[in-house]
Amino acid sequence: MTENNAKKEQVHTVFQNISSKYDRLNNIISFEQHKVWRKHVMKDMHVKVGSKALDVCCGTADWTIALSKAVGAHGEVTGLDFSENMLEVGKEKTKHMNNIHLVHGDAMNLPFEDNSFDYVTIGFGLRNVPDYLVALKEMNRVLKPGGMIVCLETSQPTMPVFKQVYKLYFKFVMPVFGKLFAKSKEEYEWLQQSTFDFPDKDKLKQLFEQAGFNKIKIRSFTGGVAAMHLGYKQKSSTK
């Protein structure tokens, strides 16, 4: 089994097992700050009514729902996730929302045509993908020329005080939550390790550029524990 496939299997197992507790776990771990961060990001996006959006690694569909409200009744939002169990939770939350379609799929091999979406988002999911660059290139492929990509993800704090608190939190507090909500030590250790292994905001910006995005805007939240990367797919050149 290749390293990428091994990571895929590990990620799939983790999220299959924590799906029913994921929303509560997310609220507790972030002290519900993920909701505040997402509201700020949505304001920065200025989503147009009637547009078409894709939420990659949509999980239980929180960001999918926010996008659904933004695009309105004449817009369309597709949520994609690798975990069937996470999608089942999302389907229950969105069953009365007619402009949402949830599908099972792989972020590194998106089942969509080129140039399909006005917006592509990924929230707290990129760190779980085996190859960040491959996933970003796939998101670029399915975006329409001039379309917007937005990633909201954990990051590495740069402020000394936040950096120290961040390390202590993940070393001592996070394991307690993990033991309460995860079924095994491996599951909560994955949640920790994937956060520590993820690139800082500047390195992630470089990956965005390598994937073909431009005009990249970075916004840090809560001392740098999370960051937004917002960029655009190059517009088609006119002859």
Curated annotation (Swiss-Prot):
Key words, A-Z: Menaquinone biosynthesis, Methyltransferase, S-adenosyl-L-methionine, Transferase
Catalytic activity: a 2-demethylmenaquinol + S-adenosyl-L-methionine = a menaquinol + S-adenosyl-L-homocysteine + H(+)
Entries under CDD domains matching the protein: AdoMet_MTases
InterPro entries: SAM-dependent_MTases_sf, UbiE/COQ5_MeTrFase, UbiE/COQ5_MeTrFase_CS
Chain ranges passing through the membrane: none
Coiled coil spans: none
Domain of life according to the entry: Bacteria
Molecular function via GO: demethylmenaquinone methyltransferase activity
Pathway, per record: Quinol/quinone metabolism; menaquinone biosynthesis; menaquinol from 1,4-dihydroxy-2-naphthoate: step 2/2
Entry binding sites for S-adenosyl-L-methionine: 60, 81, 106-107
Described purpose of this protein according to its UniProt entry: Methyltransferase required for the conversion of demethylmenaquinol (DMKH2) to menaquinol (MKH2).
PANTHER family cross-referenced by the UniProt entry: 2-METHOXY-6-POLYPRENYL-1,4-BENZOQUINOL METHYLASE, MITOCHONDRIAL, METHYLTRANSFERASE
Family: Belongs to the class I-like SAM-binding methyltransferase superfamily. MenG/UbiE family.
Protein name, per record: Demethylmenaquinone methyltransferase
Origin species: Staphylococcus haemolyticus (strain JCSC1435)
